[in-house]
């Protein structure tokens, strides 16, 4: 928002256990969408409308669950239905326990997403929420922003840019 981007945040129901959607609504000035069938908006097919507006999608933090759903073509919530409808660049930042991140199934799903054009940002190494230390930490927000700016090839000026953050 500070860079004049129109930022929309989508969350899974599970993500609301970690942070309240109101936080993102306050920061972006846009409704944070969780429920695919939320009726508190002017009628439109919301996930398709958002997908058409987005210039870039940043999936951060991306859980093993979300990665698996998208890699498997599962679209069963606001986040996954919107991502499936997007034709813009998609950037994904996995964040999870090291053992989960290194699991061959998760690695195969990330390779599959790369094959389909997703850019995967390697997780940071450090102290994780579970108490372990290792790869799996979400990269710093400044690094995520660098990836977005690189994609849109604009230095600090995001005026008119539509960014979808999940």
Predicted features and spans:
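A cross-family phosphate/adenosyl-ligand binding-site feature
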Residues: 1-90, 97-166
